[in-house]
């Protein structure tokens, strides 16, 4: 489709859509336009393709707006609903070089499977755009599968943002209760498939975003389960910032568990942060974190490059943390590559921190391989063992 303004109205697809090719969508394969409105429409069936596969659109640019009674539902008339492909697979859009907004509640309840890389419950790959999560609703039984770059909402965010404009975290007086935050994704993220079951060897696995490159993540909340093998986090598996101007703030994990039984870099909020520039703060973990090496209540591992001074501020861990090497209540392991003057401030751990193997352990930081840096105005109230 190539036009200035387009609409899909009162449309339902209940038959399977299968292709060995790329750009496969429940409604549209490729959309190139300024505006598209999808109103009172549903995709309720099985969808399979190769690269760029989405329940609504395979590959999209422009502005996509969803309104009315629209949904991607788990079952229609006894049918089986699953969105599957090899790469860039999303519950709604596979490859999104577009904005996607929901005027009314838009419900997604389907399995999403990438057999090679990049799967998201809403978008497989988000490219250079901002996704605002207002009015997107995901079922608690939803499961997103894939071996790499897998997120409950977005598999991979490249030079973009994933935000909720209304969410914020205030830590000025007391720690807010977990129930005061509304979850954006309550389901499960893991490797494996619906046919062979879940597995625990996936990389860059996150409750909201799998892998974020030069992207902001602001004001989001996760309440489900994440299982992976390396770079595993309650909000995001891996963040890599190469440019200035990005933020990771006001994010909450209140999920059941973040688990990594084999590899490294496991965090209640983020598995691995590669920092050169940006703002990091106001992050809370309430969930259980169970990892191997480099395990932390908020961050598993942080690597500081040669850019700005890094400040980690207002981090709170209120979930039990267990690991086998370099385990911390807030951060498991920091490495600096010659960076100096970095700091952790105004942070606190309230829960037990357990090291089941060798290496270091700390109430705030497990191990810091970083020169002339400091921790101040922070406290540990948990049992360290």
Positions of predicted regions on the chain:
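Surface-exposed loop/turn motifs in large extracellular/passenger domains
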Residues: 1-385
């Amino acid at each position: 489709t190539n036009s200035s303004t387009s609409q899909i109205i009162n449309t339902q697809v209940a038959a399977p859509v299968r292709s060995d090719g790329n750009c496969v969508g429940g409604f549209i394969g490729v959309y190139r336009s300024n505006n598209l409105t999808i109103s009172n429409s549903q995709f309720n069936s099985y969808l399979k393709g190769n690269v760029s596969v989405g329940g609504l659109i395979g590959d999209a640019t422009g502005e996509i707006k969803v309104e009315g009674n629209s949904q991607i539902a788990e079952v229609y008339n006894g049918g089986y609903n699953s969105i599957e492909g090899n790469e860039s697979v999303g519950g709604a859009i596979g490859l999104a070089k577009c904005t996607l907004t929901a005027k009314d509640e838009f419900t997604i309840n389907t399995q999403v499977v990438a057999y090679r890389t990049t799967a998201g419950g809403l978008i497989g790959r988000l490219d250079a755009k901002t996704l605002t999560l207002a009015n997107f609703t995901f079922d608690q039984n939803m499961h997103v599968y894939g071996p790499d770059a897998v997120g409950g909402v977005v598999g991979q965010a490249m030079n973009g943002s994933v935000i909720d404009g209304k969410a914020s975290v205030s830590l000025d007086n007391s720690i807010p209760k977990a129930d005061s935050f509304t979850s954006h994704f309550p389901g499960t993220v893991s490797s494996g498939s619906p046919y062979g079951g879940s597995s625990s060897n996936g990389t860059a696995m996150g409750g909201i975003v799998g892998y974020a490159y030069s992207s902001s993540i602001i004001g989001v909340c996760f309440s489900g389960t994440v299982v992976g093998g390396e770079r595993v986090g309650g909000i995001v598996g891996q963040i890599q910032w190469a440019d200035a101007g990005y933020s990771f703030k006001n994010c909450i994990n209140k999920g059941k568990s973040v688990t990594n039984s084999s590899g490294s870099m496991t965090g209640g909020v983020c598995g691995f942060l590669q920092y050169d520039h940006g703002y990091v703060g106001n992050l809370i973990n309430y969930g259980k974190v169970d990892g191997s090496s480099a395990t932390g209540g908020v961050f598993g591992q942080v690597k500081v490059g040669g850019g700005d001074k890094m400040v980690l501020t207002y981090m709170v861990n209120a979930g039990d943390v267990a690991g086998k090497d370099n385990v911390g209540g807030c951060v498991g392991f920091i490495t600096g590559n010659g960076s100096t003057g970095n700091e952790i401030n105004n942070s606190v751990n309230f829960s037990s921190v357990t090291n089941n193997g060798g290496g270091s352990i700390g109430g705030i930081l497990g191990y810091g391989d970083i020169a002339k840096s400091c921790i101040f105005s922070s406290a540990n109230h948990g049992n360290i063992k």
